[in-house]
Amino acid sequence: MLSIFQKKYFLVDLLEGFTDFHNHLLPGIDDGANSAEDSIAMIKKFNEFGVTNFVASPHVMGEFYPNTPETIFPALEKVKKNLPHGNSIKAAGEYMMDQYLIDQLEKNNVLNVAENCVLVEMSYFQAPINLAEILFKIQNTNLKPILAHPERYAFYHDSSFDKYKDLKTRGCDFQLNMLSLTPHYGTGIQKKAFQLLERGMIDFISSDAHRMEHLEKIGNIKLKKKQLNLLEPIIEKSKALFK
Protein backbone atom coordinates (compact mmCIF):
# COMPACT_ATOMS: atom_id res chain seq x y z
CA MET A 1 0.00 0.00 0.00
CA LEU A 2 2.98 2.29 -0.50
CA SER A 3 2.05 5.46 -2.34
CA ILE A 4 5.10 6.10 -4.55
CA PHE A 5 3.87 9.11 -6.45
CA GLN A 6 2.77 11.07 -3.39
CA LYS A 7 5.86 10.07 -1.37
CA LYS A 8 3.60 9.12 1.50
CA TYR A 9 3.17 5.94 3.48
CA PHE A 10 0.11 4.24 4.90
CA LEU A 11 0.03 4.04 8.69
CA VAL A 12 -1.46 0.54 8.57
CA ASP A 13 1.64 -0.79 6.83
CA LEU A 14 3.40 -0.44 10.20
CA LEU A 15 0.81 -2.36 12.23
CA GLU A 16 1.76 -6.00 11.60
CA GLY A 17 2.08 -7.63 15.03
CA PHE A 18 0.50 -4.63 16.79
CA THR A 19 -1.87 -5.06 19.74
CA ASP A 20 -4.70 -2.53 19.68
CA PHE A 21 -5.32 -1.77 23.34
CA HIS A 22 -7.68 1.19 23.14
CA ASN A 23 -10.90 0.40 21.31
CA HIS A 24 -14.59 -0.02 21.94
CA LEU A 25 -15.12 -3.46 20.44
CA LEU A 26 -17.25 -4.94 23.21
CA PRO A 27 -20.94 -4.82 22.28
CA GLY A 28 -23.67 -2.94 24.06
CA ILE A 29 -21.88 -1.58 27.12
CA ASP A 30 -20.73 1.87 25.96
CA ASP A 31 -20.85 4.06 22.84
CA GLY A 32 -18.89 1.57 20.73
CA ALA A 33 -20.06 -1.58 18.95
CA ASN A 34 -23.80 -2.16 19.21
CA SER A 35 -23.75 -5.91 18.66
CA ALA A 36 -21.37 -8.86 18.58
CA GLU A 37 -21.81 -8.86 14.81
CA ASP A 38 -20.50 -5.28 14.71
CA SER A 39 -17.58 -6.33 16.90
CA ILE A 40 -16.59 -9.19 14.60
CA ALA A 41 -16.90 -7.00 11.50
CA MET A 42 -14.54 -4.47 13.08
CA ILE A 43 -12.08 -7.20 14.05
CA LYS A 44 -12.06 -8.49 10.47
CA LYS A 45 -11.30 -4.96 9.28
CA PHE A 46 -8.42 -4.76 11.77
CA ASN A 47 -7.17 -8.05 10.32
CA GLU A 48 -6.76 -6.33 6.94
CA PHE A 49 -4.18 -4.11 8.67
CA GLY A 50 -2.31 -7.09 10.15
CA VAL A 51 -3.79 -6.52 13.63
CA THR A 52 -5.01 -9.71 15.31
CA ASN A 53 -4.48 -9.01 19.02
CA PHE A 54 -6.79 -6.78 21.05
CA VAL A 55 -7.41 -5.47 24.51
CA ALA A 56 -10.95 -4.11 24.53
CA SER A 57 -11.29 -1.00 26.67
CA PRO A 58 -14.92 0.07 27.16
CA HIS A 59 -15.63 3.35 28.89
CA VAL A 60 -15.90 3.14 32.66
CA MET A 61 -17.46 6.29 34.10
CA GLY A 62 -19.77 6.50 37.06
CA GLU A 63 -22.35 8.82 35.53
CA PHE A 64 -22.85 7.20 32.11
CA TYR A 65 -21.13 3.81 31.87
CA PRO A 66 -20.63 2.35 35.37
CA ASN A 67 -19.01 -0.78 33.98
CA THR A 68 -17.35 -3.36 36.20
CA PRO A 69 -15.86 -6.81 35.48
CA GLU A 70 -19.43 -8.11 35.93
CA THR A 71 -20.62 -6.18 32.84
CA ILE A 72 -17.39 -6.27 30.83
CA PHE A 73 -16.62 -10.00 30.87
CA PRO A 74 -20.04 -11.15 29.59
CA ALA A 75 -19.67 -8.72 26.66
CA LEU A 76 -16.20 -10.13 26.03
CA GLU A 77 -17.59 -13.67 25.91
CA LYS A 78 -20.12 -12.62 23.25
CA VAL A 79 -17.21 -11.61 21.01
CA LYS A 80 -15.10 -14.65 21.82
CA LYS A 81 -17.90 -17.00 20.70
CA ASN A 82 -17.40 -16.00 17.06
CA LEU A 83 -13.84 -14.66 17.15
CA PRO A 84 -12.12 -15.40 13.82
CA HIS A 85 -9.31 -17.95 13.98
CA GLY A 86 -5.91 -16.44 14.68
CA ASN A 87 -7.24 -13.55 16.76
CA SER A 88 -7.00 -12.99 20.51
CA ILE A 89 -8.94 -10.55 22.66
CA LYS A 90 -8.81 -9.61 26.32
CA ALA A 91 -10.73 -6.98 28.27
CA ALA A 92 -9.78 -3.96 30.32
CA GLY A 93 -11.36 -0.52 30.59
CA GLU A 94 -10.90 3.14 29.76
CA TYR A 95 -11.44 4.73 33.16
CA MET A 96 -12.73 8.25 33.57
CA MET A 97 -10.75 9.88 36.37
CA ASP A 98 -13.70 10.41 38.70
CA GLN A 99 -14.98 9.25 42.08
CA TYR A 100 -16.16 6.00 40.52
CA LEU A 101 -12.56 5.15 39.59
CA ILE A 102 -11.44 5.89 43.15
CA ASP A 103 -14.16 3.54 44.41
CA GLN A 104 -13.10 0.79 41.99
CA LEU A 105 -9.46 1.19 42.99
CA GLU A 106 -10.40 0.77 46.64
CA LYS A 107 -12.34 -2.39 45.75
CA ASN A 108 -9.43 -3.73 43.68
CA ASN A 109 -11.90 -3.85 40.80
CA VAL A 110 -9.86 -2.16 38.04
CA LEU A 111 -8.97 -4.09 34.87
CA ASN A 112 -5.44 -3.41 33.65
CA VAL A 113 -4.89 -2.70 29.96
CA ALA A 114 -1.36 -4.14 30.24
CA GLU A 115 0.77 -5.42 33.10
CA ASN A 116 0.54 -2.85 35.91
CA CYS A 117 -0.94 -0.26 33.51
CA VAL A 118 -4.40 1.31 33.59
CA LEU A 119 -5.92 3.33 30.74
CA VAL A 120 -7.47 6.59 31.98
CA GLU A 121 -9.19 9.60 30.47
CA MET A 122 -10.57 13.00 31.48
CA SER A 123 -13.60 15.04 30.57
CA TYR A 124 -13.11 17.11 27.41
CA PHE A 125 -14.31 20.18 29.31
CA GLN A 126 -11.86 20.34 32.20
CA ALA A 127 -9.44 18.27 34.21
CA PRO A 128 -10.79 16.85 37.47
CA ILE A 129 -10.30 19.19 40.41
CA ASN A 130 -8.68 16.36 42.35
CA LEU A 131 -6.48 15.17 39.46
CA ALA A 132 -3.34 14.99 41.59
CA GLU A 133 -5.15 12.94 44.22
CA ILE A 134 -6.50 10.48 41.64
CA LEU A 135 -3.09 9.99 40.02
CA PHE A 136 -1.58 9.43 43.45
CA LYS A 137 -4.21 6.82 44.32
CA ILE A 138 -3.63 5.02 41.01
CA GLN A 139 0.10 4.81 41.57
CA ASN A 140 -0.39 3.93 45.24
CA THR A 141 -1.99 0.70 44.01
CA ASN A 142 1.15 -0.05 41.95
CA LEU A 143 -0.49 0.90 38.66
CA LYS A 144 0.95 3.10 35.92
CA PRO A 145 -1.60 5.54 34.41
CA ILE A 146 -1.70 5.72 30.62
CA LEU A 147 -3.62 8.85 29.65
CA ALA A 148 -5.76 8.29 26.57
CA HIS A 149 -5.65 10.87 23.77
CA PRO A 150 -3.92 13.78 25.59
CA GLU A 151 -4.04 15.70 22.32
CA ARG A 152 -7.84 15.92 22.59
CA TYR A 153 -7.99 17.93 25.82
CA ALA A 154 -8.38 21.48 24.50
CA PHE A 155 -7.91 22.98 27.97
CA TYR A 156 -4.27 21.86 27.71
CA HIS A 157 -3.72 23.53 24.35
CA ASP A 158 -1.47 26.38 25.41
CA SER A 159 1.94 27.12 23.91
CA SER A 160 4.04 26.24 26.95
CA PHE A 161 3.24 22.50 27.25
CA ASP A 162 3.68 22.96 31.01
CA LYS A 163 0.43 21.15 31.82
CA TYR A 164 1.51 18.15 29.77
CA LYS A 165 4.93 18.23 31.43
CA ASP A 166 3.24 18.26 34.83
CA LEU A 167 1.28 15.13 33.93
CA LYS A 168 4.52 13.46 32.88
CA THR A 169 6.11 14.46 36.17
CA ARG A 170 3.17 12.87 37.96
CA GLY A 171 3.87 9.57 36.24
CA CYS A 172 1.50 9.56 33.25
CA ASP A 173 2.35 7.91 29.98
CA PHE A 174 0.53 9.30 26.93
CA GLN A 175 -1.43 7.32 24.31
CA LEU A 176 -2.12 9.00 20.97
CA ASN A 177 -5.23 8.26 18.92
CA MET A 178 -4.52 7.20 15.34
CA LEU A 179 -7.29 9.43 14.00
CA SER A 180 -5.66 12.44 15.67
CA LEU A 181 -3.08 12.23 12.87
CA THR A 182 -5.91 13.48 10.63
CA PRO A 183 -8.43 16.36 10.96
CA HIS A 184 -11.06 13.84 12.17
CA TYR A 185 -11.39 15.51 15.61
CA GLY A 186 -10.44 18.96 14.30
CA THR A 187 -7.32 20.59 12.90
CA GLY A 188 -6.33 21.95 16.32
CA ILE A 189 -6.18 18.44 17.74
CA GLN A 190 -4.26 17.20 14.71
CA LYS A 191 -1.73 19.99 15.19
CA LYS A 192 -1.37 19.21 18.90
CA ALA A 193 -0.85 15.52 18.12
CA PHE A 194 2.15 16.25 15.93
CA GLN A 195 3.52 18.81 18.39
CA LEU A 196 3.44 16.19 21.15
CA LEU A 197 5.12 13.70 18.84
CA GLU A 198 7.82 16.18 17.88
CA ARG A 199 8.55 16.87 21.54
CA GLY A 200 8.90 13.16 22.31
CA MET A 201 5.97 13.21 24.74
CA ILE A 202 3.91 10.39 23.21
CA ASP A 203 4.55 6.88 24.55
CA PHE A 204 1.95 4.73 22.80
CA ILE A 205 -0.57 4.78 19.97
CA SER A 206 -3.88 2.98 19.53
CA SER A 207 -7.06 3.22 17.48
CA ASP A 208 -9.82 4.28 19.92
CA ALA A 209 -12.09 2.79 17.26
CA HIS A 210 -15.78 2.90 18.15
CA ARG A 211 -17.25 1.86 14.80
CA MET A 212 -16.38 0.69 11.30
CA GLU A 213 -16.20 4.25 10.00
CA HIS A 214 -13.21 4.91 12.26
CA LEU A 215 -11.35 1.89 10.91
CA GLU A 216 -12.05 2.87 7.32
CA LYS A 217 -10.52 6.28 8.03
CA ILE A 218 -7.53 4.71 9.80
CA GLY A 219 -6.96 2.53 6.73
CA ASN A 220 -6.59 5.67 4.63
CA ILE A 221 -4.13 7.55 6.87
CA LYS A 222 -1.04 8.56 4.89
CA LEU A 223 2.13 9.93 6.42
CA LYS A 224 5.08 11.88 5.16
CA LYS A 225 8.49 10.32 5.72
CA LYS A 226 9.23 12.75 8.56
CA GLN A 227 5.95 11.86 10.27
CA LEU A 228 6.64 8.18 9.72
CA ASN A 229 10.01 8.53 11.45
CA LEU A 230 8.28 10.09 14.48
CA LEU A 231 5.72 7.30 14.70
CA GLU A 232 7.84 4.21 14.10
CA PRO A 233 9.41 4.14 17.59
CA ILE A 234 5.99 4.82 19.17
CA ILE A 235 4.46 1.88 17.33
CA GLU A 236 7.37 -0.37 18.29
CA LYS A 237 7.05 0.68 21.93
CA SER A 238 3.32 -0.05 21.75
CA LYS A 239 4.06 -3.53 20.40
CA ALA A 240 6.64 -4.11 23.16
CA LEU A 241 4.03 -3.34 25.83
CA PHE A 242 2.46 -6.75 25.12
CA LYS A 243 5.52 -8.94 24.54
Q: What residues fall within each predicted segment?
A:
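Extended substrate/RNA-proximal surfaces in nucleic-acid metabolism proteins
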Residues: 2, 66-173
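Mobile, glycine- and charge-enriched loop segments
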Residues: 8-28, 160-178, 182, 234-241
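Mid-to-C-terminal alpha-helical segments outside catalytic/metal-binding sites
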Residues: 4, 219-243
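Non-catalytic positions within long, well-ordered alpha-helices that form the structural scaffold/packing
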Residues: 47, 139, 197-198
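An N-terminally biased module of ancient metal coordination in phosphate/nucleic-acid-related enzymes
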Residues: 1-86
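Active-site beta-loop-alpha junctions enriched in small/polar residues
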Residues: 24-26, 59-60, 92-98, 123-125, ...
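Hydrophobic faces of well-ordered beta-strands that scaffold small-molecule active sites
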Residues: 19-23, 54-56, 89-93, 118-120, ...
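Short acidic/histidine-rich active-site segments
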Residues: 202-217
